[in-house]
Amino acid sequence: MILHRCFAWNRSARADAVDGPLWFPQMYQGEGRHDNPDEYGCLYLADRAVSCVVEQLAAFRGQRLSSSILRRRGLPLALAAIELDDKASLVDLDDPATLGRERLRPSAVATRDRRVTQPQALGLYRRHPSAAGLRWWSSWEALWANVTIFDRAARLLRVGAIDELTLDHPVVIEAADVFGLRLTT
């Protein structure tokens, strides 16, 4: 399965090193939907490129799209294609049968309240020790699937193409359109 990650990229970093496409930034985690940094690190990926870029641009709704929005910590944002081994299993939170088995409600999965989603993720991580991660729908577009990959699945990941994001990148334009972000001239 090919997934996508939008991340701050250091071109000279190894894939699994700090600011590489397969780096699990556990030391900086704690605010994200499924973060539990005392137990695991995770990567936030998506089934389509636009979904992960939308996640990066969401904080800038109502602003003009400028090149500074495409930088984090002085590094350019990049889009990486990441292959998850076909043998990997995901806990699919978009599957009604899974929600029933796990005694989860869709509203609790979709909430932005981290006091709800982080304990859910920790429980799933512990109950499914062979799961590579979690799959759920994007809060920006329900047809987009987001995937949280746990660090225990790092060996199941391979990096494909990496593109530095620019204002004229087609995926940036598509993602900016979701929020009505307009290019500064």
Where are these regions (language model features)?
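Extended catalytic/binding region for NAD+/ADP-ribose chemistry, centered on the ART fold
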Residues: R33-R64
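Active-site and NAD+-binding cores of ADP-ribose-processing enzymes
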Residues: M1-G32, Q63-T185
